[in-house]
């Protein structure tokens, strides 16, 4: 689509500017390696934006954070760049086809990288509560199933608040039917239950609405996505995925 191509051009220019600043901050003895890493990340980021798999707002927020970090702590900036590069590699390796699956553990590592980069911007305002059953990490799920939910939680439940908030990410095995249960919950403002459909549309982006439609196609209606919320009690999305 045209807007994706435009975002791609803008993203390319923004990333080029950001990584030029980053390269200038590196020591001369590592300049060659740093240049190769930055060039590779630049190409992947452009492709990710154009293909619609990467939120442009997250991209620009990350670039701004990296630019600021290069001036203060070049080594930390290099570590953040490696996380960013790993994220882009994961995104571009996914097909989003009906039969594409990844281990939950891989998706969780992707989410950890995403949260680490968001923490550059939000700092202590972003708190994360992990409650993962190790037995579920080998379970297979469609790629990019969890991260959009976490992104929505941060964008709508955490970032707008001065004091930030907490995101809880949970996984468990359903003992009755051996399905995988996942949930992502924020402690933000929430909403009235009868407004869930409207709120879901507002929050959806590349997340809730698309994910629900995708599960319906991938699992022939056997997967479930449920939203729980009420005013002052946050916003929670529960997933049940057959195994």
Q: Which residues make up each language-model segment?
A:
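Two-component histidine phosphotransfer core
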Residues: 2-226, 235-238
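C-terminal beta-strand of the catalytic ATP-binding
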Residues: 239-243
